[in-house]
Amino acid sequence: MSSSNLSSILRNSRIAQVPKPKGPLFSPDKKYVPTHQLIENKASTMHRQEWGMKSSIPSRSKSRYLIFDELDTQQRLTSFEAIGQYQWNRIRIQELGVVPERATAGNSFQTSADANAPSNPLFSGFSSRLSARTPLSSFFGLTSKSDAKQWKAAEKKVAALRPAFKKWLQDHHPHLIIHKDQMDPADFRKRAVEFITEIATRSSGAGGSWKVVGNGGLTYGLKGRLQQSPLGIKQNTVVEGRILQTNGMEKSVAAAGFVGNGMLGTNLRKVDYAMGDLVRTARFPFEVKQARLLENGRLLMDMSLIEPKNTARKYGYGAKENKNRTYIFQRGAVNERKISSEESAQQAEELLNILTNFEN
């Protein structure tokens, strides 16, 4: 075997490959999940020139993290970019100690647009595909822009579930099978929705066992677990944040390494009028209420402004709890028309007719 053939075999082998990238190293597109191989550029690694690649990196590159898509090239110089990308988001979440919640059928924060977005390869599955507002539409991948071909595919899926639905009725509600002609159609369709919801929360494989859902490597903590600190048990996560924009009712807030837009109401209006543009120099406490991980990997956080009692009385806010929230997210939201209740009801009616029709 010649050296060229051996080199070709080695280059094409699994031990000499990195995951195939889904795009260029540097792209302005939104990145919610890792897209390239990432290495940590420590001081000791830079000194020894060891990164696991077959060529060295220029010494002037001092970035902490590097991404690349090849171990070696014909020019003996690997293309790389000094971008931390997803790594910095993971570090920020771990520093906060917040456990992200997955978007599931029981959560009300998942919209139809997020439910039908491309799934995150780190944790895709039926367990996070169901929307609480439009369960049938989101389960079968139907949106306001679905064409006739997608509808045909959804109808085939419903028809394929008919034998399983009949067996489920025999096990859980046998009276519906025995007295089918005397049952109310509304009750019958209600059981069909219950059946769809049950199978949507289970894995499509593994013999129907519950699917283990992770947090994409953002954290390994458990929700509800007590956190220890030098001052005792830590029950809430409070971080400092700044108000970046005060024009109009929309406020831009920077907190915990994330920047987002949200409604803060009129509680800070007097502070805005008094400080003007200098409000950016003031730091306000924000409590991290919830971190939510959507199906496409987008991270959405609920931050609540904390107002001291003396400050509230000083500005005439009263003793009521401030319930205003601002939504802190990784990147901009995608504007898409949501499915109305009438459209969802019409779609559910057609799909349930197919599922409950045992005669065909």
UniProtKB/Swiss-Prot annotation:
One of its GO terms (cellular component) is mitochondrial small ribosomal subunit. Residues 1-15 have a biased composition (Low complexity). Residues 1-31 are annotated as: Disordered. Its main location: mitochondrion. It is found in: Mitochondrion. Pfam families: Mit_ribos_Mrp51. The keyword Membrane does not apply. InterPro entries: Rbsml_bS1m-like. Keywords: Mitochondrion, Ribonucleoprotein, Ribosomal protein. One of its GO terms (biological process) is mitochondrial translational initiation. GO terms for molecular function: structural constituent of ribosome. Component of the mitochondrial small ribosomal subunit. Involved in mitochondrial genome encoded proteins translation. Belongs to the bacterial ribosomal protein bS1 family. This is Small ribosomal subunit protein bS1m.
